[in-house]
Every structure is written in C-alpha cells, then in structure tokens.
C-alpha cells in the first residue's frame, strides 16, 4: 500500500470520478445524505462552517499507484480490487469547497480524520479487514465506525499506534465520536418518506441532532404553541373584563 506522495505533473492517466458501481440497497442510498446533513449540522452547532470537508461515496486517492490501478481496472472493465473510497469521510482543517474526488497529494497529504462504512453482506469482510488495516496504517484515520443495518449495531474504533482500539458503546448502543462531538446510534423514524431504522447523531445529553427540516418543524411547532397560549391568555383576560363590566 503506497503512502501519500507528490504526484507526477501531469499524471499519465485521468483520475476516475465514477466507476458505475451502485450502492447495495435503497437503505444505503438514503442513509448517506442523512449522515452528511447531520454532520454538517453538528459542525454548524460548533460554529464551524468552512474549515472541514465531508464526503460521501467519493473516490479517495492516497497514492499515485493506487490511482493508476483504479484507472486501469475501469478502462479494462476489470473486477474492482483497488481501493475506491469509504462511504462517509470527514477531514478537519481543510477548505470546504466542492471536490470531484479526494486527492491526498493535492491536499497537502491530508487523509480522512473520521470514516464511516455502511456494512453489507458483500462488503463486510473487506470493511472489517483490508479497509480497517488501510485506514489505521496508511490513512492514520483517528476514528473508524462500522454500521450494520441488519443487526442495527454501530461499532467504533480509536486509532492507537497503527491499529484500532474498540470504543465502548452506551447502554443504548450509541458510540461517541470525539471528532464530531456527538454519538452515532440507530433511531427509528421517517427519513425521505421511509420509516426505518436510521443511523443518526446524538448530542452529549442524548438528544437527537435534528436535520434542517426537523429543526424547522420543531420551531414551527413551538411558535404555534406560543400563539395558542397567547390566544388562550387573551381569551381569559377578555372573559375576566366582561365579568367585571357586568358587575
């Protein structure tokens, strides 16, 4: 596995942006934007708007030799064996501009500080072995999370040397992320019109970190309650005045 290194200028091949591979299930497709949105919301709550990057289902190039192998596999329509990228990743201390892919040598050698993989029967073994070793020994990713939609379980790991140490989950099965300052855990509810068990972020006090739509709905509900309370108080005062006027 090659270490991040300066690239040849220009590269003798084109970096691949998409290899046409699809996510395993509709759950996987819908879960990615939910995680991305809530990570963005977590950052906003910390006052961070431009000094990080969150990617989903995006190619991550950590060495020229890996990039060349990906390009060869795609060009020759070979079985994908070279590393493509994680399901979700987060990098701290970089500019938050749009990217087609993450290229380590264009980012000062920076690689993800946090990675989340959504398991499936076809990827679980690689996520638990090959990718886990890559993220620990080459990427040096500080936190690694595995999400199993079948068992509704989240596993978390902290980097310790060149290996990962398991994190202890809470009684609710949630796992703390020091990078995001939030816990990852399953939540049953509706997302994108589908009721299911989704992976969400939770505040340190255990409350759910809301999406933008949920926050707007909550705000509207509170404003409606205040309006109803004000109307009720006004009606009470009017009734009191009417009663006094009759006296």
Where are the regions that the model predicts?
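C-terminal interaction segment
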Residues: 1-24, 28-29, 33-44, 60-86, ...
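Short loop/turn motifs that connect adjacent beta-strands in outer-membrane beta-barrel proteins
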Residues: 46-48
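A structural signal for short, well-ordered beta-strand segments and their strand-loop junctions
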Residues: 53-55, 145-148
């Amino acid at each position: 596995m090659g270490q991040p290194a300066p690239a040849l200028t220009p590269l003798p091949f084109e970096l691949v942006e998409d290899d046409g591979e699809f996510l395993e299930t509709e759950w996987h497709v819908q879960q990615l934007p939910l995680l991305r949105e809530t990570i963005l919301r977590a950052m906003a709550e910390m006052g961070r708007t431009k000094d990080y990057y969150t990617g989903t289902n995006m190619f991550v190039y950590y060495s020229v030799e890996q990039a060349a192998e990906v390009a060869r596999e795609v060009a020759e329509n070979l079985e994908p064996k070279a590393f493509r990228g994680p399901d979700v990743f987060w990098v701290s201390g970089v500019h938050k501009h749009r990217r087609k892919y993450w290229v380590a040598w264009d980012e000062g050698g920076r690689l993800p500080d946090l990675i989340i993989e959504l398991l499936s029967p076809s990827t679980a073994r690689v996520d638990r072995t090959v990718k886990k070793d890559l993220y620990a020994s080459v990427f040096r990713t500080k936190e690694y999370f595995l999400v199993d939609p079948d068992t509704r379980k989240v596993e978390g790991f902290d980097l310790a040397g060149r290996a990962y140490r398991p994190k202890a989950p809470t009684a609710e099965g949630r796992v703390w992320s020091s990078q995001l300052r939030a816990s990852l855990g399953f939540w049953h509810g509706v997302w994108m019109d589908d009721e299911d068990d989704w992976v969400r972020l939770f505040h340190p006090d255990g409350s759910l970190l809301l999406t933008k739509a949920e926050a707007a709905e909550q705000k509207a509900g509170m404003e409606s309650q205040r309006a109803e309370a004000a109307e009720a108080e006004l009606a009470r005062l009017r009734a009191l005045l009417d009663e006094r006027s009759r006296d």
